[in-house]
């Protein structure tokens, strides 16, 4: 028999992420991380697409900044979202959160390998770098876009979770 829903509380227990305002704040923080990563990648892709080889010296610093940004985002979503869902949500949501967490780790490893692959980038590597950079950042953008949609869904249905 389904539990009766009374506003934000099911069976006398608060929702997983707290009140709607807390879920909204988590969602906004995740959206901010994704938007910032997108901005960083878009600026770098514009430089690479314009074949501005003379800007090659900037890319190492920018790659490490983006890598650090992705690391902060990973810590945020794992601790603030995925771990809570895995610990307290129904089985179907746990499966989703576990899969998202594993995929996130794999994606982070992929980006770290990309970052490390181009340490000490030289102008004679430009053609290979350009292709790798465009493919990697496009894949990362598509992945974080899909992930933020899934995070929105986890947060939206979290009002139904009870400990």
Describe the function of each predicted region.
Residues 1-163:
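Small-residue-biased structural context
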